[in-house]
Amino acid sequence: MFEFWPADLSKATTWPPFAIHSIDLSHFQETSSPQAIAAFVLCSIILYFGFVVVRDPLSHVPTLHWSTPLSRLSQLYTTYYHDRHFTNYSAHSEIPGKRKFRPVVRVGPNEVSLMTAAGVRTVYGGNFEKAAWYEVFSNYGKNNMFSFTGNADHAARRRIFSSNYLKSNVASPYVQQIIQSRIAKLVRFIESAVQEDSKKTQPIVVRNIYRAMQSDISTRFAFADSYGTDWLDTLNGPVNESKHTGMHVMDFFHQELREATFFWESETPFLYLNQLLVPNGPPEQQNAQKWAAGLFREFESILDKSPDRDELVRQGVYGKLYTWRNSDGEPLSFEDRASEMLDHIGAGHDTMSASLEYLTRQISLSPDVQAKLREELCVEHGGSFKTYADLDKFPYLHAVVMEGLRLVYTINFYQPRVVPKGGCTIENIYLPEGTVVGSQAYLVHRQPDIFPDPEAFKPERWLVDEEQF
């Protein structure tokens, strides 16, 4: 017979929460074996899930689906057929079709999504470590600053080149010259394309133009002004496709994030499907890594032979990675350097171009925004500005950029963190340590309590004290 203890299953400390004192074998002799086994298995499953639910530390958190406390299947289904921002956005919608949202929602057995500014500040300002999900962004089998999950590893890698990303360096005459020269070439390219296509009434595909410009800027920032790509010079044809091989292989970062292989690797790594089906990665990933490795080895050869080595090291991120040594005098391996640098170059390949493409579209569709920009840039200030400091003179331009960044979702995945020891409380909901918690800019930027009429493009909303956001 079965005997349960204690009466309150939530206080049970062992599994199963019952003891078998004796079994009457005659009962099994009278009952068919398949029926007995099926009954025993069914009872065990019911008892197990009942025990899980009773002892569940997140039972008080609203859920994506009734099955969420027990399984990730509902989350995986919507993520596979849509994407993460759709999954979490729909989870936060308390009433379908209504603009009412739940600030904290459970989207997995041990995973919580946030749609609250206070929660974002707690998680991303509270030094929470990254979840293992980030390891999908490693390259060449090595982690980089973005894919490191531990804060210590992340900080140690960041210290190598942090000076390159200081505002004082980004706003330096050297970096400004890099950016302004590529923008000037971009403007000339667009003007020429408009003149050539004016009689053909054929649209100009601006995304490829913006991708080429961004890659030219980021590679010059990574290496040195004289050793970056010149992809703006390789564009041709009605859709401005590049003739350069590198331009095509770098599209891996645009395509692969939307392919099933990324889903299997990031959402279900325990199945090892990618390792079984594409052990060396998808062809696009292999091509991107092969092209980038050749680029990095070529620049290392230049560093070894150049009489201006010290200046090249000072100017670029890769030079610092190449010459860095740890306390034992050991350098980073080539794979470590390549993984880091490919992440730096690839990270902005699609994000900046998508943001600029969205802004171009919105401004083109908004004659009133165009008129206000012309008034501010050309009439009030004569269209003259030479440094980044001059941009502070243009509050409406700043508002247009901020509104574009608010609405465009260039990074549509949420950024999971792990609740540290001791747990935390968000929106009066306690989350125990080890809980995976995260948010998406897409969600917070569409919260009507913060941004009224959130889907509308309204730059004027930023012409106030931004601290209110």
From Swiss-Prot:
Entry keyword annotation includes Transmembrane helix: yes
Gene3D superfamilies, alphabetized: Cytochrome P450 (1.10.630.10)
Pathway in which this enzyme or protein is active: Polyketide biosynthesis
UniProt GO molecular function: heme binding; iron ion binding; monooxygenase activity; oxidoreductase activity, acting on paired donors, with incorporation or reduction of molecular oxygen
Gene Ontology BP annotations: secondary metabolite biosynthetic process
Keywords: Membrane, Transmembrane, Transmembrane helix
Transmembrane feature ranges: 34-54
A cellular component term, taken from the record's GO annotations: membrane
Membrane protein topology class: Single-pass membrane protein
Cellular localization per UniProt: Membrane
Top-level division of the source organism's lineage: Eukaryota
Pfam families linked: p450 (PF00067)
UniProt family annotation: Belongs to the cytochrome P450 family.
Protein function: Cytochrome P450 monooxygenase-like protein; part of the cluster that mediates the biosynthesis of a highly modified cyclo-arginine-tryptophan dipeptide (cRW). The first step of the pathway is perfornmed by the arginine-containing cyclodipeptide synthase (RCPDS) avaA that acts as the scaffold-generating enzyme and is responsible for formation of the cyclo-Arg-Trp (cRW) diketopiperazine. AvaB then acts as a multifunctional flavoenzyme that is responsible for generating the cyclo-Arg-formylkynurenine DKP, which can be deformylated by avaC.
Protein name: Cytochrome P450 monooxygenase-like protein avaF
Organism: Aspergillus versicolor
Lineage: Eukaryota, Fungi, Dikarya, Ascomycota, Pezizomycotina
